[in-house]
Design a protein with these regions (language model features):
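Sec-dependent signal peptide recognition
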Residues: 1-2
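C-terminal motif of bacterial Sec signal peptides marking the signal peptidase cleavage site
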Residues: 6-10
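Non-catalytic macromolecular-recognition regions in eukaryotic signaling proteins
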Residues: 12-165
Length: 165
């Protein structure tokens, strides 16, 4: 009887679930944020029109091969619709749900980390977002994250770079 009581008491010390971040990372581990946007309205792409109208290719085929219906104004729609700068989600984080993510630190040599703290957001899948316009100065910003779930906390250091230019 005493052995059963000891066995049951020992089970209470086990932390439920797990959290693994040793393979965590971003497919694209950096993002360029432009201070000066190209707001030129896009114009029709003559190459796209030639492929579709003359050669008979479908618009879908052209887009899949990097030939788009318009050219120019790379940030025109970003400005017009207020689309934020966004990263890809982080990959390789495994564990018992829910897993919470937060920014652990932001480091920079030339920029201003405090200003980046004010505008940078991270969502539950590790996607970073910044508003189209901000007062973050030019520089390279290294970001570290903290992942937390029930009973576990792990850091992923210097996992993403934001280049403001």
């Amino acid at each position: 009887m005493m052995g059963v009581c000891m066995l049951l008491g020992a089970c209470q010390d086990v932390t439920p679930g797990y959290l693994q971040t040793e393979y965590a990372g971003y497919t694209m581990d950096s993002m360029v944020v432009k201070k000066v946007l190209d707001l030129t309205p896009p114009v029709p792409n003559p190459t796209f029109e030639m492929y579709v109208n003359t050669y008979g290719y479908t618009p879908e085929y052209c887009v899949q091969n990097g030939i788009y219906p318009t050219i120019g104004g790379d940030e025109y729609k970003r400005d017009k619709y207020g689309w934020p700068w966004t990263s890809t989600p982080i990959e390789g984080v495994e564990g018992t749900r829910p897993i919470f993510v937060s920014i652990k630190s932001i480091t920079t040599e030339l920029g201003n980390a405090e200003k980046m703290w004010e505008v940078l957001k991270v969502s539950g899948d590790g996607t970073f977002s910044m508003p189209v316009y901000s007062d973050v100065p030019v520089g390279r910003y290294r970001i570290s994250l903290t992942f937390t779930n029930e009973g576990y906390t792990q850091d992923v250091n210097d996992c993403f770079t934001i280049i403001v230019k």
